[in-house]
């Protein structure tokens, strides 16, 4: 299963930037595990988006864990919206990632 995570900053950008290095290190770990396929900030910079691949049988538990362990969430500078996603067009391309 795929999912989109919309990250919205809850604090001023200067507060968010204090935790950006640890947030990016966390995301690199998810990428190495094959969970994170792509990520990046929104423009203008008021949050970001993650494209995730999670096991069908543990999707909600995995998504909750991803959210709860993100340093942005742990330090209270951002919140997540999690959207399980049923990919139609392009699914075969994502499956190759």
Language-model segments: residues:
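Conserved, structured core segments of small domains
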Residues: 1-97
